Amino acid sequence: MNGRRSFLRGFFAVLLSGGAIEGVMKLFPSKALAKEAARTGKWYGYGVSVDKCIGCARCMDACKNENNVPKEPFFVRTWVERYITRKNGETIVKAIAPGDEATPEAASDRTILRSYFVPKLCNQCANPPCVQVCPVGATFQTGDGVVLVNEKTCIGCRYCIQACPYGARYLHPKTHTADKCTFCYHRIAQGQLPACVEVCPTQARIFGDLNAAASPMSRFLRMNKIHTLKPGLNTEPKAFYANLDGEVR
């Protein structure tokens, strides 16, 4: 027993040393580097207050205009889903398009228990499967936690599109490369908000540095009961939801 205790003490002493941490990072580079970045610098996250979303689709319009996303409704970097839960337990989900009626559902329909909107986008995972499957390194994670795509090196193999559990990627019909939400990286690098956050009339969308205690994101996380999508997949998403129903996946 004493020998076992001595071994464990020695094991944990080595584990806590810098050399052991470096070894772990070599074995699990994407996850370890994400954790390291989260501790040392800016680490961007996104919040959605579901009860505030009115389904106006201004966010979708702003995103398309800002990022040259094709106008066709099936090409999106961010989208909004309408959820209708009926009293019999049935849940109906439909993605809305710009110009759709914003009212979740007629109040006169007595079969409806609840109707609401859920904005969705790339979850900017701390442990992103899309980065891990890219055979040429075109999909990568920045030091501040944003997953981007290098159009110059992307070969359009679609592996990342298939690997994304959130359905947040598509193949751009003109560039033939993978495309997705980037948190409007060109804007946030200059201290601006993502276009979708800036135009939201109800402040249902929130953005900020998770490591800054006074940032809108940090306040959002402190003041709400928070959920993430598909938490069991160990992707460590950085899109956080308040007032999210269990039906949402």
What are these model-predicted stretches?
Residues 22-62, 232-234, 240-241, 246-249:
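C-terminal segment of N-terminal export signals and the immediately downstream linker at the start
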Residues 16-20:
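Intrinsically disordered, low-complexity regulatory domains of metazoan transcription factors
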Residues 195-249:
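Long, compositionally biased charged/polar accessory segments in the mid-to-C-terminal portions
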Residues 28-50, 64-124, 136-143, 147-151, ...:
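Sequence context of c-type cytochrome heme-c attachment sites
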Residues 27, 32-36, 58-80, 127-153, ...:
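Iron-sulfur cluster-binding cysteine motifs and their immediate structural context
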Residues 176, 180-183:
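Catalytic cores of enzyme domains
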Residues 1-15:
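N-terminal secretory signal peptides and thylakoid transit peptides that target proteins
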Residues 106-107, 113-131, 238-249:
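Short flanking/linker segments adjacent to small metal-binding domains or redox-active Cys/His motifs
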